[in-house]
From Swiss-Prot:
EC number: 2.1.1.199
Native source organism of the sequence: Haemophilus influenzae (strain ATCC 51907 / DSM 11121 / KW20 / Rd)
Gene Ontology CC entries for this record: cytoplasm
Keyword Transferase: yes
Catalytic activity: cytidine(1402) in 16S rRNA + S-adenosyl-L-methionine = N(4)-methylcytidine(1402) in 16S rRNA + S-adenosyl-L-homocysteine + H(+)
Presence of the UniProt keyword Hydrolase in the record: no
Gene that this sequence comes from: rsmH
Family: Belongs to the methyltransferase superfamily. RsmH family.
Entry keywords, A to Z: Cytoplasm, Methyltransferase, rRNA processing, S-adenosyl-L-methionine, Transferase
One example GO MF annotation: rRNA (cytosine-N4-)-methyltransferase activity
Protein name: Ribosomal RNA small subunit methyltransferase H
């Protein structure tokens, strides 16, 4: 086995590194998927625990993550430029359906993505209003905000950001861009512009949270279809896993965690059978597909102190029956 240190990642502090990888209950000759390669922290640690017969397939839709993955020269490793919802197609292509010993997902935006102003993810840094994980596909946030209605934007802000002032913020954004058309001025095109506009639209300020936090989250989730991607993966993951294969998923906000928690709970219960029927235990447990492993895990105080961005992370693990 290789040492973990030989695979150190310099740019990004990986959240719940040991907990998430330990959740996979690695077999040294196993086949694993890291569905969110990012800057490779989890992948490098997994590789350090595998024998020469082990295998790791990593997936990411961010071109910069793919470039980082190409730095790993290891015959046990391969990278796929795709979103994790396409893991079933990748497994089919590689003849690995039902043979995967574990799938790991880290649903957070990586620190480099947040810190690179030109990606447009952060209201703390001025940059183009992009927000796409894969900058080669789909509409940017700027392009979408030019054409969205107040009603649709309000829905996005409420649904994906749980923003209490969604209607007020949506109206301010749409009115700004309508005014730009009318007066021949510039559309919203910078993260700093959007953050300032949101700040002006919100009547009450939370001193512990920037007024634009929820709106930026909501727009990013919508632009990247993040919850649709997660739902698609969850619906297909069981077919990819071998018996006793594990799902280890880190989420960073309540919408994602709710989906993961509900999925694991539902798949661990088996058939819904009316109470009181004289059935054997094996009949009651028929169709039970997952076993939940332990309780949800959150970062320690020490990890949060070392990496404040980890504070909202929640890890859930389940095993294929």
């Amino acid at each position: 086995m290789n040492s973990e240190n030989s695979f150190s990642s310099s740019e990004h502090i990986t959240v719940l590194l040991h907990e998430a990888v330990n959740g996979l209950a690695l077999k040294e000759n196993g086949i694993y998927i890291d569905g969110t390669f990012g800057r490779g922290g989890h992948s490098r640690f997994i590789l350090s625990q595998l024998s020469s017969n082990g295998r790791l397939i990593a997936v990411d839709r961010d071109p910069r993550a793919i470039a980082e993955a190409h730095k790993i020269q290891d015959l046990r490793f391969q990278i796929e430029h795709n979103s994790f919802s396409h893991i079933p197609e990748i497994c089919d292509k590689l003849n690995l359906v039902g043979k995967i010993d574990g799938i790991l997902l880290d649903l957070g935006v990586s620190s480099p993505q947040l810190d690179e102003a030109e990606r447009g993810f952060s209201f703390m840094k001025d940059g183009p209003l992009d927000m796409r994980m894969d900058t080669t596909q789909g509409l940017s946030a700027e392009e979408w905000l030019k054409q969205v209605s107040i009603e649709d934007l309000t829905w996005v802000l409420k649904t994906f950001g749980e923003e209490r002032f969604a209607k007020r913020i949506a109206t301010a954004i749409v009115d700004f861009n309508k005014s730009a058309v009318k007066n021949g001025t510039e559309f919203l095109s910078r993260t700093s512009q959007l953050a300032e506009l949101i700040s002006q639209a919100v009547p009450f300020k939370d001193k512990h949270k920037h007024p634009a936090t929820r709106s930026f989250q909501a727009i990013r989730i919508f632009i990247n279809s993040e919850l649709d991607e997660l739902e698609s993966l969850l619906n297909s993951a069981l077919d990819m896993l071998a018996p006793e294969g594990r799902l280890s998923i880190i989420s960073f906000h309540s919408l994602e965690d709710r989906m993961v928690k509900h999925f694991m709970k539902k798949q661990s219960k088996g058939e819904d059978i009316p109470k009181g029927l004289p059935l054997r235990e094996d009949q009651i447990q028929r169709n039970q597909k997952l076993r939940i492993i332990g309780k949800a895990i959150q970062p320690s105080d020490a990890e949060i102190q070392a990496n404040p961005r980890s504070r909202s992370a929640i890890l859930r693990v389940a095993e294929r029956i």
